[in-house]
């Protein structure tokens, strides 16, 4: 790997880390057949109780920041060749996939509101990460498609790329938006905090006592179980060999 490429990677990492106050430190460097980066983040929790991915309860309201799914559309676009002068939805899709923004400000404000019981970033897709939010306590969720933040531009991009917008939104991943379980009794406090979110926040469903995730379509039908889009799997089952 050229030294210039490595320098560019570290400059990009520094730019991405700057809003959080994270400082990049040196480490072991060695030669290998391919470029491999191994990163460790070390820090401390300040005053107050940290918000983890555990703690959701039945009846909690589910909110997500930003517009998940754009990164999935960006990947589909780039697989067809990188546009030389992207504009409109093409530029938005490429930005979402190549330069995602961590929601530092939103996370801090949400935690300070005292209304968020559990929180996780959307890196593997909403359905996969929502499962992580619910599985420890054996809970489920009901989501409503009509409330998903899918803009006209998002739907136009999905149609142009041949990607189901529901699949992109629920299973895309690499958006790094925040998915939060909000206590209903403290919803007003959360909404006050959300006014300061640059990315905004949208209510997409609620936590249920019954396990499993169900999605109510706009036409009134339901998606659940194997019919749901799948997100990224870190340990997918091995493919069967065909003779």
Describe the predicted segments one by one.
Residues 46-99:
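Phosphate/diphosphate-binding glycine-rich loops and adjacent basic-rich segments that engage nucleotide
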Residues 12, 43-45, 74-75, 79, ...:
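Glycine-centered structural positions embedded in regular secondary structure
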Residues 35-37, 95-103:
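A glycine-rich, Thr/Ser-enriched phosphate-binding loop motif common to dinucleotide/cofactor-binding enzymes
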Residues 50, 74, 106, 130, ...:
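Hydrophobic side chains in well-ordered alpha-helices
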Residues 62-66, 99-126:
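Internal active-site segments that recognize and position negatively charged phosphoryl groups
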Residues 1-25, 30-37, 42, 112, ...:
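Glycine-/charge-enriched secondary-structure boundary and capping motifs
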Residues 52, 109, 169:
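Short, flexible, glycine/charge-rich loop motifs used to bind or transfer phosphoryl groups or to couple energy/partner
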Residues 6, 55, 103:
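Short, conserved glycine- and acidic-residue-centered signature motifs
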């Amino acid at each position: 790997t050229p030294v210039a490429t490595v320098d560019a990677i570290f400059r990009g990492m520094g730019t991405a880390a700057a809003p959080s106050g994270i400082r990049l430190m040196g480490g072991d460097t060695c030669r290998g057949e391919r470029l491999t980066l191994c990163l460790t983040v070390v820090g401390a929790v300040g005053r107050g109780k940290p918000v983890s991915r555990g703690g959701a309860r039945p009846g909690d309201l589910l909110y997500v920041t930003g517009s998940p799914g754009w990164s999935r559309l960006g990947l589909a676009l780039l697989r067809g060749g990188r546009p030389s002068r992207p504009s409109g939805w093409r530029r938005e899709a490429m930005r979402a996939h190549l330069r995602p923004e961590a929601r530092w400000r939103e996370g801090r404000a949400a935690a300070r509101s005292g209304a968020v019981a559990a929180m996780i970033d959307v890196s593997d897709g909403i359905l996969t990460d929502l499962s992580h939010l619910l599985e420890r306590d054996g809970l489920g969720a009901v989501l409503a498609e009509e409330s998903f933040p899918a803009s006209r531009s998002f739907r136009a991009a999905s149609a142009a790329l041949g990607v189901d917008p529901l699949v992109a939104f629920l299973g895309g991943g690499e958006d790094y938006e925040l998915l939060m379980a909000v206590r209903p009794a403290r919803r007003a406090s959360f909404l006050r905090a959300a006014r300061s979110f640059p990315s905004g926040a949208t209510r997409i469903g609620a936590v249920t006592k019954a396990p499993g995730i169900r999605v109510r379509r706009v036409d009134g039908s339901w998606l659940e179980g194997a019919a749901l889009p799948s997100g990224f799997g870190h340990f997918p089952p091995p493919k069967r060999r065909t003779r």
